[in-house]
Curated annotation (Swiss-Prot):
Keywords: Calcium, Metal-binding, Repeat. Gene3D superfamilies: EF-hand (1.10.238.10). It comes from the Eukaryota. Pfam families: EF-hand_7 (PF13499). This is Calcium-binding protein SPEC 2C. Ca(2+) 1 binds at D23, D25, D27, K29, E34. Ca(2+) 3 binds at D94, D96, S98, S100, E105. GO terms for molecular function: calcium ion binding.
Length: 151
């Protein structure tokens, strides 16, 4: 399925685990009753109207109940919306418009929003963690993955 390529293997595992925890009868589909029970198990009481509204947001084909692919598609839709915001943030930080964030660009940005300013070692650790191709800079895709993995 193409939408699965949008997510990392780790993300898919988390989504699948969450899905299975709601799918009480294990049939691969989530019914309104299962969704309501899942919320009730964490002491959140929702009206049937709210449950129906939530189901409709995910159930694009109106088939009720919803399956895992519909959940993935909704999550991808949400992440694509956030992706545009991440791209704007990246572009604002990429002051030399090189298509990557240098340690200096990251240091400037982080020192403006942290007090006390982050140390060189702390910034180097961030770059090392985010730098998938080990070129010492953070490319746009690496930046988006870094932001997404922190949530």
């Amino acid at each position: 399925m193409a939408v699965q390529l949008f997510f990392t293997e780790e993300q898919r595992k988390v989504f699948k685990s969450s899905f299975k925890s709601i799918d009480a009868d294990g049939d691969g589909k989530i019914t309104p009753e299962e969704l309501k029970a899942a919320f009730k198990s964490i002491e959140i009481e929702l009206t049937q109207e709210k449950i129906d509204e939530m189901m409709s947001m995910v159930d694009k084909d109106g088939s009720r109940p919803v399956d895992f692919s519909e959940i993935l598609m909704k999550k991808a839709e949400q992440m694509r919306g956030k992706g545009a915001q991440y791209f704007k943030a990246f572009d604002a930080l990429d002051t030399d418009k090189s298509g990557s964030l240098s340690p200096e660009e990251l240091r400037t940005a982080l020192s403006a929003c942290t007090d006390p300013p982050m140390t060189k070692e702390e910034i180097d650790a961030i770059i090392k963690k985010a730098d998938g191709n080990n070129d010492g800079e953070i490319r746009r895709a690496e930046f988006v993955r870094m932001i997404q993995s922190s949530y």
